[in-house]
Curated annotation (Swiss-Prot):
Protein family: Belongs to the LovG family.
Alphabetic keyword roster: Hydrolase
Designated name of the protein: Esterase CBG03338
GO molecular function: hydrolase activity
Catalytic EC class: hydrolase
Disulfide bond sites: none
GO CC terms: cytoplasm; nucleus
InterPro entries hit by this protein: AB_hydrolase_fold, FSH-like_dom, LovG
Annotated organism of origin: Caenorhabditis briggsae
Catalytic center residues: 106, 166, 194
Amino acid sequence: MSSQPKLRILCLHGYRQCDQSFRQKTGSTRKLVKALADFEFVNGIHSVAVDEHSETSRAWWFSNADQMSFSSREPTDVSVGFDESVNAVVKFIEDNGPFDGLLGFSQGASMVHLLIAKAQLGEIKLPGIRFAIFFSGFLSLSSKHDTLTSLRIKDFPSMHVFGDSDEIVARPKSEKLADQFDMEPIRIAHEGGHLVPSMSKHKERITQFLREQMAPIASA
C-alpha cells in the first residue's frame, strides 16, 4: 500500500535571515504537520552588506537605494534587486519543483504575495502552486509594486498568521494583506511578536487548511 502523498511547500525567509536560519525558526510548525507536508527553503540572493554576518543575512529587495537597506514601514519609489529575486525564485521552482504552496515570513511573506500577483497577471509562471501561508505578512510600500499590491487575488486559498504584539509588522498591516484575497482567508492571531509562533494551539486549523489543499494531489 503506497503512502499518502505529501504537499511540497517552498519557504521564503524574512529580511536579514537566510534559508537555514528560517528552517530552524519554523521547526516546531514543520514538526506539527510533518505527516501532511514537506518544506523546502530558498535563499535570498542579496546579501545585507551592512551586516557583519552577511552570508547568513539576506534580502529579497531593498527599499533604500543609498543604504541598500529595507523597511516595511516607509513608503519608497524603489525596489532594488526585486526583479532579480523574482527570477531566482522562479528558476528555483523550475529546477526543484513541482511545489504545491508557498510560505513566507515578513519580507518573505510580502515576496510571496508579489509573486502570486505577478502570476495572476500572467507576468510569471508558478506551476502547481495553488495556496500560500503568510507569517507577519504585509503589502509592499514601494510604488514600483502598486500594480501588484492593488490587485485582488482570485481563487487562491491563503492562511495569515500575525502577532498582536508585533512591533515590526503591526497586525493591521497583516490584516490588510489578507484583505487582498477574494477567497475568504484563514486568519490566526497569536499573542507574540515578530516571529513564527508555535502553532500547537492552532493545530486543528492549520491541519484542516493543509488537508483541504491535499485534495488535488490525492486524486492525481
